[in-house]
């Protein structure tokens, strides 16, 4: 387990679009040193950008690595996924040990969007992983800062 905990790790997720309220996005990043960076920009009703940074315990980082590893996202390829478009884009970059992978696709509203793609199984894995990571990040941020992230 000590070797697993010392494994190189980095994860960055971004989802956003440029619309009538400007550049609206959600982005978070887990770093190997335990830092979690979070940014949420919504210009709706003149909201301002929310930026938060916290340091996580090794146990939380280990859980994040487990979530990524068990999702098997590192075996996927985004070549047959929908290209980012005017509706928006999602990016996911992961470094886990000696593996480094980066994905870019359009925004996914629901599982129906996954089923209509050329790679429904791969996109479904991506969709569920992103949902799990967002849930984890929102919980960590709201517990730490006592704010509502969205």
UniProtKB/Swiss-Prot annotation:
The record's tissue-specificity note reads:
Expressed in root and shoot meristems, cotyledons, vascular tissues of leaves, receptacle of flowers and siliques, and pollen grains.
Task: Give the main localization category.
Answer: nucleus
GO molecular function terms listed in the Swiss-Prot or TrEMBL record: RNA binding
Q: Which Gene3D superfamilies match?
A: Mago nashi
Signal peptide start and end residues: none
GO cellular component term of the entry, any: P-body
Classification via CDD domains: Mago_nashi (cd11295)
Does this entry carry the keyword Nucleotide-binding? Answer: no
One GO term of the biological process aspect: regulation of translation
Keywords in alphabetical order: Acetylation, Cytoplasm, mRNA processing, mRNA splicing, mRNA transport, Nonsense-mediated mRNA decay, Nucleus, RNA-binding, Translation regulation, Transport
Record's function text? Core component of the splicing-dependent multiprotein exon junction complex (EJC) deposited at splice junctions on mRNAs. The EJC is a dynamic structure consisting of core proteins and several peripheral nuclear and cytoplasmic associated factors that join the complex only transiently either during EJC assembly or during subsequent mRNA metabolism.
Q: What is this protein called?
A: Protein mago nashi homolog
Supply the source organism for this entry: Arabidopsis thaliana
Name of the gene this protein is made from:
MAGO
């Amino acid at each position: 387990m000590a070797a697993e905990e010392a494994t190189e790790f980095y994860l960055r997720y971004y989802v956003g679009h440029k619309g009538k309220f400007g550049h609206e996005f959600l982005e978070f990043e887990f770093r190997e040193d335990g830092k979690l960076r979070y940014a949420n920009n919504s210009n709706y009703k003149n909201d301002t950008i929310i930026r938060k940074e916290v340091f996580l315990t090794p146990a939380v980082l280990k859980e994040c690595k487990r979530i990524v590893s068990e999702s098997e996202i590192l075996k996927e390829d985004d070549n047959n996924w929908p290209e980012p478009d005017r509706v928006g884009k999602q990016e996911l970059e992961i470094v886990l040990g000696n593996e480094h992978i980066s994905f870019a696709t359009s925004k996914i509203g629901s599982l129906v969007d996954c089923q209509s793609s050329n790679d429904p199984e791969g996109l479904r894995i991506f969709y569920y992983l992103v949902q799990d990571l967002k849930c984890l990040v929102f919980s960590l941020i709201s517990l730490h800062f006592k704010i509502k992230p969205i």
